[in-house]
Amino acid sequence: MTADPLDYSGKRVLVVGGSSGIGNGIAHGFRARGADVHVWGTRPSASDYENEEGSDLTGLGYSQVDVGSSDAIASASAPFDGLDVLVHSQGAVLYRRQEFEPEGFNKVVAVNLASVMQISMRFHDALAAAGGSIIVVSSVGAFRSTIGNPAYAASKAGAVSLVRTLGQAWATTGIRVNGIAPSLVDTKMTKITMDSEERRERALEKIPMRRFGTVEEMAGVALFLASPLASYMCGQTLIVDGGLTL
């Protein structure tokens, strides 16, 4: 019998930003298929997410790490003695034109781009030893203008470019680097759209499939990218947007 390529039993997975939203869905996707999963989040303990919509830390290891701080990343404890899959699902966005100011711009870029590089470097050797995989969750905002959010758009475009560059640079070490670019998924980060019927309808009109994506669908793509099914994929970012960017 052929082994199940989506069986992650015994695999060690770290999901940065896995305490809520897409990252949380990805974390549970790997856990459901046998992986040992640890997540990094922003709150002091896992109990601080109890009863929080879009957050379920059942069965997941947890650490508080402020990925906007290079010192916090450098001093954070490694969750396992090795690592098979590193998922970057950290994200920040600021509204009311805060990203047009240096402080706001730099804050968003630190989380969405700089931390991706630093954390990937931090776990490079462990991933290389395991022949592991890095998955970077960016956004379709990387490929189109995002009015009012210059830092978000620029940082996500940078993340897509980083996937290509690290994919090429680290392929010979046995690490595969790929990414996912979702469109609108109903999470905490998209509440400004989801909580407004007018904005929701306007957004749906632009999506050929006429619905929003789900965290489970993003998890499915992550499971594919980290699996032997994608063993020859390197440096690619898959757009998962219901046809929005067509």
PLM ranges: what are they?
Residues 19-20:
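Conserved glycine-rich cofactor-binding loop
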Residues 96-109, 203:
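Substrate-binding pocket helix/loop in short-chain dehydrogenase/reductase
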Residues 117, 211-240, 245:
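C-terminal substrate-recognition "lid" of short-chain dehydrogenase/reductases
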Residues 120, 155, 163:
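Active-site helix of classical SDR
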Residues 139:
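Residue(s) in the substrate-gating loop at a strand-loop-helix junction
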Residues 145-153, 165:
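Active-site loop-to-helix junction immediately N-terminal to the catalytic Tyr of the SDR YXXXK motif
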Residues 171, 176, 233-235:
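Short, small/polar-rich loop/turn modules that mediate ligand/substrate recognition or access, typified
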